[in-house]
Amino acid sequence: GSTDVSSASGEAKNLEEVSVVLDWYPNGSHVFLYDAIEEGYYEEEGLKIKVEFPSNTNDAISMTSAGKADIGFYYMHDVIQANANQNIPVVSIGAAVQNPVNVLMSLGDKNIKTVADLKGKKIGYGGSVLNEAFVKTMLKNAGLKEDDAELIDVGFELMSSMTTGQVD
């Protein structure tokens, strides 16, 4: 899905349209983008921003590298891997956040309070090799082995995979 979030005054101007694919659902990491649109900063620079919402976890890099989007929000480590291992022609032009925004969460009735409580549980992670590595590192640092928990790639379905019982 997508949305044209430029203000109405942009319609009267001759603006260059720029498509931006998000890395995830709109969230706090994208505040600066929406704020600049709302304040008219892009229009002042002659740009009309069209925000695209991804349908899967690699849309930002695949759409950008295929020329179907001008800019994609993506994860630094995945851009490096794409360049190094898959020869995908994308470059990093800036950082939206300065630190990873990964979190560990579960439903309250699962009684998971620490990483050690994940023993015997099904752990969902969002669609990348690095996210899987983050989970494995958390387990190791808590004194658990990789096979002490079941790791499941749930893509964008982090919340629904918990509420449906697919993961803990």
Q: What annotation goes with each model-predicted range?
A:
Residues 11-154, 160-164, 168:
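Short, glycine-/small- and polar/acidic-enriched structural segments
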Residues 1-15:
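Short, low-complexity, disordered segments immediately C-terminal to signal peptides
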